[in-house]
Amino acid sequence: FRSYYGHSIDNTLGRDANGKASKLKGALCLGSLDFTYNAHNWIARGHFDYGHLGDAEEVRLLPGRQTKTSPFNRDYVGKAAIACGLEVGYNIFSQIEKLRADNQKLYAFAHYEYYNSYIPTAMQPKFPYTEKHRMAVGLNYYPVPQIVIKAEYSQRFLKRQYNNEPSVSLGVAYEGFFL
């Protein structure tokens, strides 16, 4: 478990010391929880992250938040953001003696995540496209412990008026230490 609390105003953004902004603190509270289980040929991982920003409606109006070349008037800053996910995989090669003896692994896995980068205050507009659900299934093949070949099919599920986003991903990763 990890957490953080602090004031986000006046870190790098100057403000009018006598104006309305002088009363703002932009209290930021973050919390994070994660776990990993790796035993008996199963691997499971999960996480939960949440952040809350005080004075979110007023932070949007502070001067100096955008460059002069920005095409946007003022972007909204939500009061909160959330991300959570769960992944479970099973080592299929654990049931095949020769592959198990060679220390090869083939994990079939499923993954689910939910995230929303903009949770508005009651006075702010809602942007439903910021809320996303994602599911994935795939295989992770370890021919040797330091190399993994990955294949994944995933789909992001958006609100009805938007298109879902399917994808296929292939990759190779190497785990090593640099001296």
Regions found by a protein language model. Give the residues of each.
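Outer-membrane beta-barrel pore domains
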Residues: 3-179
